[in-house]
Amino acid sequence: MIGMLKGRVESVDTSNAVVDVHGVGFELRMPSNDLTAMHMGQDVKIYTSMSVSQDAITLFGFLDARSKRMFLQLQKVSGVGPKVALSLLSTLAPDDLAQAIHDGDDKALSRAPGLGRKGAQKIILELKGSIDVDKIETGEPTSTQRIPTDKGVEQVVEGLMSLGWKQADAQQAVDSVISSSGIALPLEEGNVPTVLRLALTSLDRGR
């Protein structure tokens, strides 16, 4: 099972991206917002989910872990496959999608191509109680929304950059650590060393 890729964008279009990982090109189906944010030659870290059918093996990719979790959660609803789940994430950012499910907003969900009103209502019925709205309110990063940068976060990012990490990789690691640990923003000075240590561990693990 391929859970994550780190490599360089070889090509990108409106529905797919090819990422070169040590000379091997992985073709990925991705949400439109993620594809728009990518460009050729860019170094990326992509969270992946593999779908196996009778006709093909498809690798789906996401620029943040929350999008991948939402993608998998949507498929727990009977009748919702990877194509519909991807369509939803191409129409609504994960936080907006979670909020729409929590609020019972079937009109917002049915804007996704391939999903009708009844399908939207079924998703709401089956997932409404399992969507964690607290993660929305704390500003967990998505492909279109990142954790707001404050002085504490800037200190951590600058510290990682001084150790040789690229700014984009450093920022992504800090965002991920803050989201997964539940540390509140703005980042207090006392939490800066903790976040720095956790982010550095995450980056070293991803090498």
Swiss-Prot record:
Pfam family, one: HHH_5
Membrane-spanning residues: none
Subunit structure: Homotetramer. Forms an RuvA(8)-RuvB(12)-Holliday junction (HJ) complex. HJ DNA is sandwiched between 2 RuvA tetramers; dsDNA enters through RuvA and exits via RuvB. An RuvB hexamer assembles on each DNA strand where it exits the tetramer. Each RuvB hexamer is contacted by two RuvA subunits (via domain III) on 2 adjacent RuvB subunits; this complex drives branch migration. In the full resolvosome a probable DNA-RuvA(4)-RuvB(12)-RuvC(2) complex forms which resolves the HJ.
Residue numbers spanned by region Flexible linker: 143-153
Entry annotated with the keyword Nucleotide-binding: no
Task performed by this protein: The RuvA-RuvB-RuvC complex processes Holliday junction (HJ) DNA during genetic recombination and DNA repair, while the RuvA-RuvB complex plays an important role in the rescue of blocked DNA replication forks via replication fork reversal (RFR). RuvA specifically binds to HJ cruciform DNA, conferring on it an open structure. The RuvB hexamer acts as an ATP-dependent pump, pulling dsDNA into and through the RuvAB complex. HJ branch migration allows RuvC to scan DNA until it finds its consensus sequence, where it cleaves and resolves the cruciform DNA.
The record's note on its domains: Has three domains with a flexible linker between the domains II and III and assumes an 'L' shape. Domain III is highly mobile and contacts RuvB.
Listed Gene3D superfamilies: 5' to 3' exonuclease, C-terminal subdomain, DNA helicase RuvA subunit, C-terminal domain, Nucleic acid-binding proteins
GO biological process, alphabetically ordered: DNA recombination; DNA repair
Lineage start: Bacteria, Bacillati, Actinomycetota, Actinomycetes, Bifidobacteriales
Protein name in the entry: Holliday junction branch migration complex subunit RuvA
InterPro entries tied to this protein: DNA_helicase_Holl-junc_RuvA_I, Hlx-hairpin-Hlx_DNA-bd_motif, NA-bd_OB-fold, RuvA, RuvA_2-like, RuvA_C, RuvA_C_sf
Source taxon at top rank: Bacteria
Region (Domain III): 153-207
